[in-house]
Curated annotation (Swiss-Prot):
Region forming the signal peptide: none
Parts of the chain that traverse the membrane: none
Stated family: Belongs to the NadD family.
Gene name tied to this protein: nadD
InterPro entries reported in the protein's UniProt record: Cyt_trans-like, NadD/NMNAT, Rossmann-like_a/b/a_fold
UniProt KW Nucleotide-binding keyword: yes
GO MF annotation list: ATP binding; nicotinate-nucleotide adenylyltransferase activity
Function noted in UniProt: Catalyzes the reversible adenylation of nicotinate mononucleotide (NaMN) to nicotinic acid adenine dinucleotide (NaAD).
Protein known as: Probable nicotinate-nucleotide adenylyltransferase
Pfam families registered for this protein in UniProt: CTP_transf_like
Enzyme class: transferase
Reactions this protein catalyses: nicotinate beta-D-ribonucleotide + ATP + H(+) = deamido-NAD(+) + diphosphate
Transcription regulation among keywords: no
Native organism: Acidithiobacillus ferrooxidans (strain ATCC 23270 / DSM 14882 / CIP 104768 / NCIMB 8455)
């Protein structure tokens, strides 16, 4: 079994527009299941796979930091926010792997994102840099997956956490987390309609949103 190190890391990237309890609970449950001490949240600066975020990168980074300020097991990276150009996951993971050559890296990804994973920039190389922890059980016929992704799943799927921890990277693990039906788009809609999204995200984040006047209807 791969020996555990203090550099082992669970990773969650996203626009976090805004960050909410769905993000935080998923990464915390994966962190505990993998018995990894640290998790890193990485707000995207210029996400290449979706339209521009509603809040600018400075605000999204600030909200992410506020959300985990009192939780020392979480760190927040500003790499993608500070970097010029598109926020390609493979570039961020390459930098992380250079810093932590022997560590177990486990990137959390939702089922919807996994079904489009073969469209990501250099997606196959990503699997050489990190494990993928897909937060959901596969509920589709494998034949419906794109051929390249189906082959990757066949070659790299891990059945359990112990199998994943044998190596620093390269496994795809499906892991069920608490299903919190929270979406950033719904939170934005509530705010634009002058309704409160309290209890969907940390109070401190909501206070920041109110103070900065974010997500208000035009």
């Amino acid at each position: 079994m791969h020996s555990s190190t203090h550099d082992d890391l669970v990773i969650l990237g996203g626009t976090f527009d805004p960050i909410h309890y769905g993000h935080l609970r998923a990464v915390e449950e994966v962190r505990q299941a993998l018995a990894i001490a640290q998790a890193m949240l990485i707000p995207a600066g210029h996400p290449p796979h979706r339209k521009s975020p509603w809040a600018d990168a400075r605000h999204r980074l600030a909200m992410t930091r506020i959300a985990v300020a009192h939780h020392p097991q979480f760190t927040v990276s500003s790499w993608e926010v500070e970097r010029e150009g598109p926020s390609y996951t493979v570039d961020t993971l390459t930098a992380l792997r250079q810093q932590r050559p022997d560590a177990v890296l486990a990137m959390v990804i939702g089922m919807d994102a996994f079904l489009r994973f073969d469209t990501w920039h250099h997606w196959q190389h990503i699997l050489d840099l990190t494990h993928l922890v897909v937060t959901g059980r596969p509920g589709w016929p494998a034949a419906e997956l794109p051929e390249a992704l189906r082959q990757a799943l066949y070659q790299r799927r891990c059945e359990d956490v112990d199998a994943l921890r044998q190596t620093p990277a390269g496994c795809i693990l499906f892991h069920t987390v608490t299903a919190l039906e929270i979406s950033a788009s719904n939170i934005r809609s509530l705010l634009a309609g002058h309704q409160s999204p309290r209890f969907l995200l940390p109070d401190e984040v909501l206070d920041y949103i109110d103070a900065e006047g974010l997500y208000q209807s035009p």
